[in-house]
Amino acid sequence: MSRIGKRPISIPGGVDVNIEGNVVTVKGPKGTLTKEMHSLINIAVEEQQIVVTRPDDQPLSRSLHGLTRTLVANMVEGVTKGFSKSLDMVGVGYRAAKQGNKLVLSVGKSHPVELIPFEGIEVEVPAQNKIIVKGMDKELVGDFAAEIRKERPPEPYKGKGIKYENEVVRRKAGKTGAKKGGKK
């Protein structure tokens, strides 16, 4: 039995869970999330808990069991608390600004990069070099944060670029000076 999959998910107050076939709909204070799960896994609501079960011990069923439970748990957490991901910009002249609903990045390119957040995603810029991506869908929050990071990933020599707040950038030593004259 999957250690993660067999744990029931408790439904907090103010959250409504509706399961039709393999489509799970979760309504809460922050909004509504709907996701279609794999038809092999059974999802049921039993006395203020969501229980995820699998029909057999086939490798596919076993791998989907924990995944489905985690996806449903993330939906419940998303409509109650929401998710956020912070990014830091390291480098001279690297800055972010919000113009309307667009995020404008100055990351050393010949032009400012404009990114439009996905639907249901909110972007905050508390400082010029800090970006916070918020939303109730964990997958979309992570995808948009990755989209921002992709514009200028951190480089290993000076660490310049856009990195996640808790990301550790592996640093490399630079070139050592060559002797005068060199090889002949």
Swiss-Prot record:
GO terms for molecular function: rRNA binding; structural constituent of ribosome. The keyword Coiled coil does not apply. The keyword Repeat does not apply. GO terms for cellular component: cytosolic large ribosomal subunit. GO terms for biological process: cytoplasmic translation. Part of the 50S ribosomal subunit. HAMAP family: Ribosomal_uL6_B. This protein binds to the 23S rRNA, and is important in its secondary structure. It is located near the subunit interface in the base of the L7/L12 stalk, and near the tRNA binding site of the peptidyltransferase center. Belongs to the universal ribosomal protein uL6 family. This is Large ribosomal subunit protein uL6. It comes from Desulfitobacterium hafniense (strain Y51). The gene is rplF.
